[in-house]
């Protein structure tokens, strides 16, 4: 996946997350919406992590394509 594709995926997920937050703020969120919000947050963490990995590999002169998606438990516990 190219960085541009990854950034586009992040943009779409952020948009979806904002829509879900709006539903939550209005008291209109269902259980399924809250569950989806959790999934989107986790997936965003993974996407941002992958983008950072790709960037770091490129800077180090390595192949950014060798970066891989890490599990949710790993990326959720990073200090940012």
What would you call each of these model-derived segments?
Residues 1-80:
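Extended, charge-rich alpha-helical interface modules
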């Amino acid at each position: 996946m190219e960085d541009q594709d990854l950034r586009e995926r992040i943009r779409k997920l952020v948009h979806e997350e904002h829509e879900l937050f709006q539903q939550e703020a209005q008291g209109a969120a269902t259980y399924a919406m809250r569950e989806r919000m959790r999934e989107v947050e986790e997936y965003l963490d993974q996407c941002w992590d992958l983008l950072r990995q790709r960037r770091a590999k490129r800077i180090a002169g390595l192949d950014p394509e060798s970066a891989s998606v890490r599990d949710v438990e790993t990326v959720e516990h990073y200090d940012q």
